[in-house]
């Protein structure tokens, strides 16, 4: 039975990053996003958005930080919405663009 109130969230990149410190290539993340979009997944959680003052970009890959530019390099406007996870106390919420300017929805 189809239930439109149920939404599907894929966290492959965000959760998988726990194993490799979010060191996925942009090409791989782009392919994952495209596959999710083709499959009709509602939300693609592409990583964390944490403050670079707390975590070193030399130690962690780009999906630990989810800069807007990196997200736009791999995702595109479609029915699948881009999401990121935030941890209270580890995120600079001022770094988020307003929703109407961001690919993160």
Q: For the regions a protein language model found, what residue spans apply to each?
A:
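Short N-terminal helix-initiation segments at or just after the protein's N-terminus
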Residues: 20-26, 48-51
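N-terminal small/glycine-rich loop or linker at the start of catalytic domains
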Residues: 1-21, 77-81, 94, 101-102
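Short amphipathic alpha-helices and their capping/turn segments at secondary-structure boundaries
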Residues: 1, 30-40
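Glycine-rich anion/phosphate-binding loops
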Residues: 22-31, 101
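A short N-terminal beta->alpha junction/helix N-cap motif
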Residues: 17-24, 58-62
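Residue-level marker for well-ordered alpha-helical positions
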Residues: 6, 30, 68-69
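Active-site beta->alpha loop and helix N-cap motifs at the rims of alpha/beta catalytic domains
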Residues: 37, 43, 48-105
């Amino acid at each position: 039975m189809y239930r439109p109130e149920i939404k599907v969230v894929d966290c492959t990149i965000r959760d998988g990053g726990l194993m490799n410190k979010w060191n996925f290539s942009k090409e791989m993340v782009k392919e994952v996003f495209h596959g999710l979009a083709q499959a009709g997944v509602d939300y693609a959680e592409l990583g964390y958005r944490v403050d670079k003052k707390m975590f070193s970009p030399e130690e962690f890959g780009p999906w630990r930080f989810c800069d807007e530019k990196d997200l736009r390099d791999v995702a595109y406007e479609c029915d699948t919405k881009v999401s990121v996870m935030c941890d209270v106390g580890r995120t600079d919420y001022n770094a988020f663009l307003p929703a109407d300017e961001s690919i993160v929805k």
